[in-house]
Amino acid sequence: KPNSTTTFTMEWDAVIPHQIRRAGRNNREGIDMTMTQWYPKIAEYDYDGWATFDYIGREFHAPFSDFDVSIKIDKDYVIGAGGTLENPLEVQGYDAKANIKSDNKNKATWRWTAKNILDFAWAADRDYTVEEFTILDGPKVYYVYQKSEKTKLWEESKPYVTKFFQLMNAAFGQYVYPSYSFIQGGDGGMEYGMCTMILGEGRSLEGLVGLMVHEGGHSYNQQILAYNESVRPWMDEGFTSYYDDYVMHQLFPPKEPVANPFVGSIKSYVSFTNTGKEDPAVG
């Protein structure tokens, strides 16, 4: 009933598969676990009815929720997640003064909270490094990744990510959450509540920043505005692509100045429509 409350208590078992489309263990860059779409989820009910479509490797939609998550794992792991770590002094990676607490099985418990987000995702690896920086009038940003020669561009990307949030906040509205985490994991790039999972090796600086800009841009649509991508996929990817062009044009100005940074996307769209494969945007 409207304005009523129901409490569900659930127990479930699951096997973490080898890395599949979005989640799993031992991805191609050696990340131990990428834990996305990992728990039974309550379906969202909105103007389109119940959102009961599968989440497997595809878009997802869910109710805004508050999360209080405890994860017990071997104490030598470092976890990256979307949310606020409530006990950084009891686990490794987030505070140099940490006194890691573990039980008699050498397991530590991590406690994360997050308010009013669509989904809680996390990843764990024994070789993660955690770096953080705070953006003026913006979120605290966390980088959680395997620091090596293959990921050296992460350090160089920080001023670009800072500028990304500043440009987005000025042009499209304030990012409303206290933090955002870029986490090395998964199989490409996928956004979740207050974080994204991305592959972190190789690429050029512009390629890495472009991936971060795209996935971070989703936070303004798929997460804050909560477009249902299964019903209107063009709204999330379309607006996020618009953000991409707007931001990247300023972060990496073309050698030959162009009056309209969206010309390339417009030409691609026209080319696609000429194939006759275009579906109606609304229908």
Task: Indicate residue ranges for each PLM-predicted region.
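Solvent-exposed beta-hairpin/edge-strand motifs
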Residues: 1, 32-36, 72-77
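Short Pro-Gly-centered flexible turn/kink motifs
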Residues: 2-10
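A generic secondary-structure signal for well-formed alpha-helical elements
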Residues: 13-20, 46, 71-77, 172-176, ...
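Glycine/proline-rich low-complexity spacer/linker segments in large multi-domain proteins
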Residues: 13-63, 67
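Short, solvent-exposed loop/turn and secondary-structure capping segments
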Residues: 18-27, 80-83, 122-124, 192-196, ...
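Hydrophobic helix-coil surface modules that form long, contiguous segments used
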Residues: 41-46, 57-213, 242
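Active-site-proximal alpha-helical
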Residues: 168, 243, 271-283
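Zinc-dependent metallopeptidase catalytic helix centered on the HExxH motif
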Residues: 197-274
